[in-house]
Amino acid sequence: MKKFALLFVLLMSLAAVLLAACGGSSGSCGSSSGTSSGSAPTVHMCGNNFVQTSITISKGQSLTLVDDASAAHIIANGSWVNGSAQLKKEPGAPVVNNLQFNGNDSKTIGPFNAAGTFRLYCTVHPGMNLTVIVQ
């Protein structure tokens, strides 16, 4: 009986460590600011979320995504809706077909040449959506 109790405690401790490693955000994540003066619009990714969920950019601009943590991301056109991934090619949006981030890197999407509202999502992390508003 003592061996069973010890095994149970060890398994629960391991589960707690794994859950803590997968969730939350670290203190080393990027700024929530959408742009810096004089630079391209930027959205940071931290853990399993975009630091900000929407950004407004000007027609003709590109968007830089920055992965501030070691989490891998695969970004595509579309969004998560009620826990289900909805791949969607939107007219006027640059095609984003499984753009891979392997942690601590950045990539640029665009240019966004048409005005409108476009959606991007991480195919790996449910609920990780970004709305890009182009004016």
Model segments located where?
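Extracytoplasmic copper-binding redox domains, predominantly the cupredoxin/blue-copper superfamily
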Residues: 5, 17-18, 22-135
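Bacterial N-terminal signal peptides that target proteins for export
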Residues: 1-9
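Core hydrophobic alpha-helical transmembrane segments of single-pass membrane proteins
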Residues: 11-16
